[in-house]
């Protein structure tokens, strides 16, 4: 019992509920009187939808939530002396350790209590807000008081001093977490303190114990109390949902004995101190470029800077942490800017530091130098000066949470898009072929960034995700090479500078008889180079597991073939740089031209009835019937600056005895460009595609009188099934099919 004028701090009756003490007709759970203390009484629904007088709250006709001005009730939960926006502050009976700021009672404390009475000597108040100026100088060391004499309150922007307007709750406040009884969980925009023994996943903190809770749009710029994981920030007025505040958040002084939470709370007496950072930005929803600058404060010794940016209502927030090693953090959607953060499983991670081993990151930004050792999917790694990576249709940041596989060939592209091509060791970011699950092998549509040799070529290519790694979208970039040099780990293919020299190819001596076509004898009239081993031209290497994906290895092991500048004794082409890439729809006219050129050589040009429309429909739709590789070389005779000099058409078939096969239907290199290694590189790429798509072999047809090609492929190890197995190839033409279809 609390008598008027008497402050009793030790009278508790644990686990005793006295509903009879309430007047008739009033709910004992929503009643507060200056009479008998009722310990452990749960008084939820402290919802006050309108402005009330400083000491009285009468929210409805049932007279629940009545605040009677008077002496402090030690064991009764009092509602907030302020206007609470719609939302409910629910307190569960199972919440142990409730805080009571006016009386120290073992096992009982209430969070968010506003008590007019002074604290006693034996009380341990944690984060009570006292508004009575009479006791402005008596608060204990661990007590925050918003009074006129308070000098240590760390409040950003505006502190509301009026008791009638104090501690306004923002919309969508407290609600019960069903998976954690007794835990108070807030929706966004919550400003109350929390119980000491309750992990509060509120709007301004990320709790790693509850990774499924996506809290958003809040800052954590100050340090929490040891028992209350609470950020004592106040902001003038309610915050509009879904908008970022352009305010400067200041660090709130923290108390001794705090337990740093995983969301970035640290005691100032410890070695690592987190500082709030100014973030000024306008409204910027997720999936758009973040507007406004973000400024990291000065890095002091062992300091961690915490910027938790706001990204709008209903969207995930990002958090930026700088320096300091943090182990076993599993915070999603964090911007992490530090060195050595092992064991982190971060999604949508911004990283601006040195190597971070052991990180598995989806869709990250990295603007550091080199990230060797990282295993990162769909990661864009620009050079040292490239802060913003050119993304699909513009130069803008990658949106957090966006998967590159969602921006496939149907996404808008940016014409004439240039991609910086600095050397980046051990990053498989370029030259990776990627395949759509419905389009096995290497899809024809890619992004190709040329160098100066290809400055006037078509800039637009398209992407297709790899079926093994659907979240990856990579660039296939042509990079200039210096003579006699090699680039390791950058996987930048077959971009050759016409400097008249030949790069060092270990054991490779390109002759004029390297790329015979299955249908056309490229070396007719000359003897095959019998001194060349079978591996001189194919060189199919077994890549590692990460390179066996169709999106990667079909191009990743061709660095030694970057520069094919050879001397041809036949006098057709003394030297030439060439580039092999997947075909795109714009290549249909050139492909048809090469098909007719091959048919003309074989004496069957009149049999070609195919049109460009047929090629486009059958090879570049949703379910392509064939795939193509094209070879290009610089040319001054074309407006684009390059000329298509060869192609390979293939598709997939099935052998009921051994399984999936890659069938090479047509393979042709223009006569002027034969003998400089283009056909050999084309075969190598086709072989890698067959391996990556889990084919059991590659088969093709060679015209019977092309003895040079027969000998060439036999030397490489191909079996002549016409001789080995005695096969004859038959075909029914359309007329025959019509007759067969009509037969009964």
Curated annotation (Swiss-Prot):
Protein name (record) = Spermidine/spermine N(1)-acetyltransferase-like protein 1
- Quick one: which residues bind substrate? 601-602, 665, 699-701, 725
Which PROSITE patterns would you find in this protein's record? GNAT
What would be an example GO MF term here? acyltransferase activity, transferring groups other than amino-acyl groups
Identify which top EC class this enzyme belongs to: transferase
- Report biased composition (Basic and acidic residues) as residue ranges: 510-523
Organism this protein belongs to = Mus musculus (Mouse)
Q: Which residues bind acetyl-CoA?
A: 667-669, 675-680
EC number from the UniProt entry: 2.3.1.-
Q: Where is the composition biased (Polar residues)?
A: 1-20, 29-50, 59-86, 142-158, 212-230, 248-259, 485-509, 553-569
